[in-house]
């Protein structure tokens, strides 16, 4: 069984960046408690427009599918929806660059 690396872009709603960062930092620990992600440390960064990007690893596609039925994960995602919109990577200016660079966000 191989892992699945995902890249997610969270565009904060006005005035919600700090709440979003707190949720992003707690996302993988929450998913670990549910045994859905690997031990890989996520990479969190910021695009020029303020969008937060996270790279993390699920245990498998089955784990991703299970998350969509897990009440703890669904509750976490509802908190995300209150403070951000998930956007496609191609909406970021950096995605048009050969070597997309982002600002690292410390833990």
What residue ranges belong to the model's regions?
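Short, flexible turn/loop "capping" segments at secondary-structure junctions
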Residues: 1-4, 45-48
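Active-site-flanking beta-strand signature of metal-NTP-handling nucleotidyl enzymes
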Residues: 3-11, 53-55
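Short, flexible beta-strand-to-coil junctions
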Residues: 10-13, 47, 92-94
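Short, surface-exposed ligand-recognition loops at beta-strand->loop->(often short) alpha-helix junctions
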Residues: 11-23
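Short alpha-helical
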Residues: 15, 49, 62, 97
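An amphipathic, aromatic/His-enriched active-site/gating alpha helix that lines ligand/cofactor pockets
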Residues: 26-41, 57-94
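Short acidic/glycine-enriched loop/turn segments that link adjacent beta-strands
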Residues: 38, 48-51
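Acidic/histidine-enriched, glycine/proline-rich intrinsically disordered or flexible terminal extensions
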Residues: 92-107
